[in-house]
Design a protein with these regions (language model features):
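Catalytic PLP-binding core of fold-type I/II PLP enzymes
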Residues: 157-186
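A glycine- and small-aliphatic-rich helix-loop capping segment at beta-alpha/alpha-beta transitions
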Residues: 53-59, 82-91, 162-166
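Buried hydrophobic positions in well-ordered alpha/beta secondary-structure cores of metabolic enzymes
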Residues: 24, 48, 67, 103, ...
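Local beta-strand N-terminus motif with an aromatic residue
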Residues: 64, 140-141, 175
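Acidic, glycine-rich active-site loops and adjacent beta-strand->loop/helix elements
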Residues: 14-15, 42, 71-74, 150, ...
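Conserved beta-strand/loop elements of the cytosolic catalytic core of P-type E1-E2 ATPases, chiefly
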Residues: 27, 150-157
């Protein structure tokens, strides 16, 4: 990583970048065969938004234009990433951002009920995704963006496996792409 030179990866490559890509492919046990590197998390989110759009258009589903993210999230400083970040962060920029539906964040310190187990609370939060998908119309939802560990806005709150499993099920059921924003958590 100390020797990677930032180049526009659509047209150029370099040996350290290729070695890193090969290493990541090996770690994935054959699940991944391509990579695309970005200079920042914001650019990665922008790329994921574009990729989600192209994916659905190529599949003959151009009506999938809605994206969902979580309240209290931070996905970056570009306009697309700001669109996905908590809505309270950008009223100044609201004329420029893409509207995104927000569902409650997983934040047990503030939102878990006293009589609720951690798993029950996590599933309640995850089920808000299904409600949002159905409210928007499942055939119009492109992607759900989620931070697995919310860093800057909640103070390093990890998401439990039961939540992640449930959102995976929901996304698979309705044809929604699941995008993990893991830039800050490593």
């Amino acid at each position: 990583l100390d020797s990677v030179v930032d180049t526009h990866s659509m047209f150029f490559t370099n040996a350290p970048q290729e070695e890193l890509a090969k290493h990541l492919f090996e770690l994935s046990d054959g699940h991944f065969a391509r990579s695309l590197f970005f200079s920042s998390g914001s650019e990665a989110i922008e790329g994921a938004l574009k990729l989600a759009r192209q994916f659905h258009v190529e599949r003959g589903e151009p009506q999938r234009v809605n994206v969902i993210s979580r309240q209290k999230s931070y996905h970056g400083n570009t306009m697309g990433a700001l669109s996905l970040s908590d809505a309270s962060r950008g009223p100044l920029f609201s004329p420029y951002v893409v509207p995104a539906r927000q569902i409650p964040a997983y934040f047990p310190y503030r939102d878990q009920q006293a009589d609720e187990s951690e798993d029950d609370y996590a599933l309640r939060c995850a089920d808000a995704l299904e409600a949002a998908v159905l409210d928007l119309g499942a055939e119009t939802v492109s992607a759900f963006f989620v931070e697995t560990v919310v860093g800057s806005s909640l103070g390093v709150v990890p998401t439990p496996p039961v939540y992640l499993e449930r959102i995976r099920e929901i996304c698979d059921q309705y044809g929604v792409l699941l995008v993990f924003d893991e830039v800050m958590c490593g």
